[in-house]
């Protein structure tokens, strides 16, 4: 299979020979009760699979040879592999461990953000990596970003017309977006509009990012080419989008676990047609997805009263159809990739068996060991080597405006009226030093942050929206300890207090991604959250809080490569200092 979705001519001829009886299937699912997503019926059938493709679904049994594995599905229920149409697989994880973890609970297709590739490597190497991902049993597709969702000093170096068009044309890229910089589109950015139109000409949909958008804005964005949006926070938000013709992703994420309430509101509103709805976890951190991905969303939908057949379609077929991939994914029918989940009960979407491209991932609840295939060093994504030093001069804080953390996503500016010239800040005011510093040591941006984790001596993270280094703390002494440790472990997240290292998470792939199993990352993630909460962190997810410190698609004030940013007006109020 080429590009994760197309078979060669000789393979197609071989598939037909299975029907003719001259070639035996590699796997037979016998006596299956399966969900036909096209008719919304549970039907009895034998399912023939040849390698990675479903060949036949019906009453007949094939000619069998010793090479045919027979699995009896009597008393079990079979549904299509689940699809996550909006994945951010880089949140304290890497795409391979995210995919393999998701597959264990039935999510066998991920459509992924490509933004981190822009920051980690060049286009040629990125394309080589995603071609390698096609060799996984999980189907891995990508979307093409139009903006960096932060303010970069060399934005055009990372995201430009040549690169965007090359991404759009790549066969593993199945949609454009997500469009976080939609205000620029409305303000007349014709380059952005050109990219969107080229994506549409390629037959690929566009994912928006439209939290809180009015009907007027939603209408304008539809006219400019946006196909779908996943930022609805209420049932009314969903209905507004549905009525305008949007595909709507219902979100259950660490900072927006809205799905249960949204489903209740939709059912109360009388909605009975769910064809334009999908599910997404929108980039869960490891601990949040410890029990799975789309299986969790389907379970919530079933528990809230969504009809079974619709709940499973929302977790599979709807996404495939929206992405123009329903000939390959999202159903149990001839010609589809053999992504199949075997359930003990219809009402329980947590599978006891998972097939991905016809390969067992889970069999009779036992996880099958699938070896890693991504050699990160081959693409020069290695440890983060820092060959420069943080100095006392870097820890000078004289800007009069600080960052007031209101919740997981909102940061407001405030006037600093404290004396912040000391080696330590008093935790009573909730203030800490904050520094965003270039990973190569060329520039820095300094101010004060209030309401993050005011009791903590130091946090340092090479994980950030721009790939630079974030430092937060109330003790300069602890900051230097954290800095030295970051250099020693060559990238990661480190917490220090009173000279003691409390927690550290190694991120050995470019300082941004881990190269450890998901089980370990789940432990790290929980440890990070628990430790920060002890030191005053009052919000849900610290990983997202770190990521969003620089994100210009959220209100109202951000720390970016260019300086402190007024998000609404896109003005740099205090520019970065060159070192």
Swiss-Prot record:
One of its GO terms (molecular function) is adenine deaminase activity. It is an enzyme of class 3 (hydrolase). Keywords: Hydrolase. It catalyses: adenine + H2O + H(+) = hypoxanthine + NH4(+). CDD domains: AdeC (cd01295). InterPro entries: Adenine_deam, Adenine_deam_C, Amidohydro-rel, Metal-dep_hydrolase_composite, Metal_Hydrolase. Its EC number is 3.5.4.2. Pfam families: Adenine_deam_C, Amidohydro_1. The keyword NADP does not apply. SUPFAM superfamilies: Composite domain of metallo-dependent hydrolases (SSF51338), Metallo-dependent hydrolases (SSF51556). GO terms for biological process: adenine catabolic process. Belongs to the metallo-dependent hydrolases superfamily. Adenine deaminase family. This is Putative adenine deaminase OB0751.
């Amino acid at each position: 299979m080429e590009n994760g979705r197309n078979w060669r001519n000789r393979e197609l001829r071989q598939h037909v020979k299975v029907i003719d009886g001259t070639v035996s299937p590699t796997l037979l699912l016998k006596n299956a009760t399966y969900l036909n997503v096209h008719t919304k019926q549970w039907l009895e059938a034998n399912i023939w699979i040849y390698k990675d493709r479903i060949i036949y679904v019906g009453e007949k049994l094939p000619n069998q040879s010793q090479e045919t594995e027979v699995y009896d599905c009597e008393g079990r229920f079979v549904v299509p592999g689940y699809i996550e149409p909006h994945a951010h697989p880089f949140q304290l994880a890497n795409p391979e461990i995210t995919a393999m973890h998701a597959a264990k609970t039935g999510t066998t297709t991920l459509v992924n953000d490509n933004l981190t590739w822009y920051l980690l490597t060049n286009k040629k190497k990125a394309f080589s990596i995603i071609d390698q991902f096609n060799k996984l049993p999980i189907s891995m597709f990508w979307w093409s970003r139009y903006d960096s969702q932060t303010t970069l000093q060399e934005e055009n170096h990372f995201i430009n017309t040549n690169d965007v068009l090359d991404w759009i044309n790549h066969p593993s890229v199945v949609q454009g977006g997500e469009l976080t910089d939609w205000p620029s589109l409305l303000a007349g950015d014709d380059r952005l509009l050109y990219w969107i139109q080229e994506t549409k000409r390629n037959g690929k949909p566009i994912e928006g990012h439209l939290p809180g958008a009015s009907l007027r804005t939603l209408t304008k964005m539809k006219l400019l080419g946006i196909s779908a949006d996943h930022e609805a926070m209420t049932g009314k938000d969903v209905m507004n989008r549905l009525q305008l013709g949007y595909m709507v992703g219902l979100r259950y994420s660490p900072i927006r676990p809205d799905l249960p309430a949204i489903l209740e509101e939709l059912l109360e509103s009388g909605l009975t047609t769910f064809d334009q709805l999908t599910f997404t976890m929108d980039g869960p951190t490891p601990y949040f997805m410890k029990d799975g991905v789309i299986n969790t969303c389907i379970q919530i939908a079933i528990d809230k009263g969504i009809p079974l057949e619709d709940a499973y379609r929302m977790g599979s077929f709807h996404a495939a159809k929206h992405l123009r991939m329903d000939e390959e994914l999202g159903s149990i029918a001839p010609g589809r990739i053999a992504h199949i989940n075997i359930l003990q009960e219809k009402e329980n979407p947590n599978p006891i068996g998972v097939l991905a491209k016809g390969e067992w991932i889970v069999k009779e609840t036992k996880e099958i060991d699938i070896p890693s295939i991504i050699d990160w060093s081959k693409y020069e994504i290695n440890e983060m080597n820092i060959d420069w030093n943080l100095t006392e001069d870097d820890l000078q804080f004289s800007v009069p405006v600080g960052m007031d953390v209101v919740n997981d996503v909102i940061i407001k500016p405030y006037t600093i009226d404290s004396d912040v010239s000391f080696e330590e800040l008093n935790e009573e005011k909730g203030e800490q030093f904050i520094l965003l510093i270039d990973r190569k040591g060329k520039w820095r941006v300094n101010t004060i942050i209030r309401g993050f984790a005011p009791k903590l001596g130091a946090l340092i993270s090479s994980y950030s929206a721009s790939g630079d280094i974030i430092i937060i703390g109330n003790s300069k002494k602890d900051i230097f300890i954290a800095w030295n440790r970051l250099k020693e472990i060559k990238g990661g997240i480190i917490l220090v207090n009173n000279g003691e290292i409390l927690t550290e998470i190694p991120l050995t792939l470019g300082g941004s991604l881990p190269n450890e199993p998901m089980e370990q990352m789940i432990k790290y993630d929980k440890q990070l959250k628990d430790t920060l909460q002890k030191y005053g962190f009052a919000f849900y997810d610290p990983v997202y809080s770190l990521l969003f410190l620089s994100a210009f698609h959220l209100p109202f004030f951000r720390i970016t490569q260019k300086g402190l940013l007024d998000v609404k007006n896109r003005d740099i109020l205090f520019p970065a200092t060159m070192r």
